[in-house]
């Protein structure tokens, strides 16, 4: 680890993404995880040199350069408020936010640099751009978004599907959604444009959850030093 390592606070450290973030950050000499926040009081206060805190103790979190949040909607407001209070950037991949929480995000972007995204993979960033272009180039074509995930994923359509739908809608399409929950599928998204006698399919398949964690860590590094505002993943990784 270098003396100028970026100090990272990971919020939602007990989830699948949180665990991946902890593991990958430990392998990155440019990062130092100064705190890991979990929902309940942790059974161990320090794991592999990383201090663990309960969500109720968030206000006492150590100094950090950037926070990364992959938690649940009910835990989102406190980490957003902490970052705004301390003037620190936030990277969040928490899905299922309601309109009030989205409004809070927009308000916070007046004070801090932040990026909220349903998906931090490089491939999905490219897919989103392609969907925008296809929707604008194929007016009048039917647009369908099919998404598949593991059986434990609760929100449907997925946040990524909705993001792709927003990209399509912004270019004039009217997307419909189909969701599948089966087995241990990490994540698959197909955006299908259907015209008369022809069909275009744009597909992204994730086979390893590490791609999302790597993208979030990369975005966190790039967000430091940015002026206040709401950024897209593609603004930071492409």
Swiss-Prot record:
Cross-referenced SUPFAM superfamilies = Glyceraldehyde-3-phosphate dehydrogenase-like, C-terminal domain, NAD(P)-binding Rossmann-fold domains
- What GO molecular function annotations does the UniProt record carry, in alphabetical order? 4-hydroxy-tetrahydrodipicolinate reductase; NAD binding; NADP binding; oxidoreductase activity, acting on CH or CH2 groups, NAD or NADP as acceptor
One GO cellular component term of this record is: cytosol
Chief localisation class: cytoplasm
* GO process terms (BP): diaminopimelate biosynthetic process; lysine biosynthetic process via diaminopimelate
* Family, per entry: Belongs to the DapB family.
Identify this protein by name.
4-hydroxy-tetrahydrodipicolinate reductase
**Species the sequence originates in:** Xanthomonas axonopodis pv. citri (strain 306)
What gene name is listed for this protein?
A: dapB
